[in-house]
Amino acid sequence: MAEPKSTAEPSYDCDFLIVGSGFGGSVSALRLSEKGYDVLVLEAGKRWRTEDFPKTNWNVRKFLWLPALFCYGIQRLTLLRDVLVLSGAGVGGGSLVYANTLLVPQDEAFNRGTWPRGTDWKQALAPHYETAKRMLGVVPNPHLWEGDRILLEFARNLGKEDTFRPTNVGVLFGERPGQSAGDPFFGGEGPERTTCTYCGGCMVGCRHGAKNTLDKNYLWFAEKLGAKVRPETLVTGIEEDGQGGWLVHTRRSTRHVFRGRRTFRARGVVLAAGALGTVNLLLKCREQRRLTRLSPALGGYVRTNSEIICGATARTDEVDYSRGIAIASGFHPDPDTYVEVVRYPKGSDVMSFLGTLLVDGGTRLTRPLKWLGTCLSHPLDFLRTFNPRHWAQRSTIVLVMQNLDSAFRLVRARRWFWPFGRGLTSRRDPGQAPIPAYLPIANQAARHIARQTGAFPSSSINEVVLNVPTTAHILGGASMGTTPEDGVIDARNRVFGYENLYVVDGSMIPGNLGVNPSLTITAMAEHAMSQVPLKDQRAGLRHLPVQARAAGAGIVLPDAVLEQVL
């Protein structure tokens, strides 16, 4: 005789379990905690203190996230068939390693891609952009450097000088570099801070406490409101528990034996593991028949922000382009394109191994042949590409982004180098514009900088040898849509076909933005969480002790920046 099913309430570890602690996960953690929910955040990476970051990226165990090689740093590198992806790892996600740049896209970005119909997304997100700016401490960069002056000259040559601007960034600036400033953002309720020293170390991990990483704002207050953060915890699967909740299976991410497997039970789940992490997890769960009702659009409409990364490297050591913040300025050569110069700090030369001599576009067959020809015709410069010494000081990196639509698909398949199991890879969908591995304006910018600095122009080696672009801003794969046929989630970030399952990270974005996407991810996360009801309507919001105000008020330097360089 079958025993009757128990009607007792199952024991839950939390109301909401959040997978990932980047921009989407951190916003979700704070706003759900404010609404009275018990929140648990699981993060595969480590928790970092300011003094723990590597002094240079030659300390690869602290810089790169390659657990198989016992490297547990903040920078992931993922090579797929169609793109090389740079992303972040650690409590705070991409904010630990990103270039601080927080920009609102051009209006046209909201009119392309697969944004859900029936909503004016520019208008809908406008108040959430303002909230995100306050929380992330967005201010204009107050100082330009030599690379920025060269970029301004390039903009002037194109007749686009009027579009050149210092970037809006999430950094604490002050009248004196390295000055202790208490908490200038949240009325003393936030962590103590130190002003920027312009060392250029934003993308290696800020060792001064000037960078407004998520552990200093959203996550800081989420934890003050009771949210729990468990670092070094990798989510391996999710499934319904049969009683209206969710089972989340995990293991320790930094162990190779005794992996500490554990299953958590939650009433709701927010997936915020970044585009690669979230899409891979959902594809794996569908493959294992744990989530069989997922949209067929899962894995599709993946975009790279149509990015190209190139630059120029001086032939002499008697220069220093590493001073400043990671990205200090940019301009629009046309309404669809944005160009920035990027820098690494002095001594952080390990990324030089991703560079080689610049060549123009072609196919996967012809472009390597062009590269070989360039190497033969410029043998000394070719040999210089193998010398990492003082690379960060000698190099000016160019980052170009476009909001023009192009996409590919993420899939799980057996790969030629490891046929024993399935892993994440990519393929192109018929009828979709391929992602660009070459943009003429990018090469034009690199050559201009090279001429002005006595340098040789350079490109990412994967772009010229494999015809595969590099992106630090992979988007989509679980993107918004009007129906399950054209999206994985609805306009409120709810996964089609499931209750209390959300996606809130870069994978939700349904189009190329053409600018650095962190501010948009934050604003869209604010929008998503604003739709979630209070846990107890009678209790109301658990407000922060003080409302976030305009970042750095009273200590921001004057805005008249352009006059310094014009």
Predicted features along the sequence, with ranges:
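N-terminal Rossmann-like FAD-binding beta1-loop-alpha1 element of flavoenzymes
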Residues: 16-41
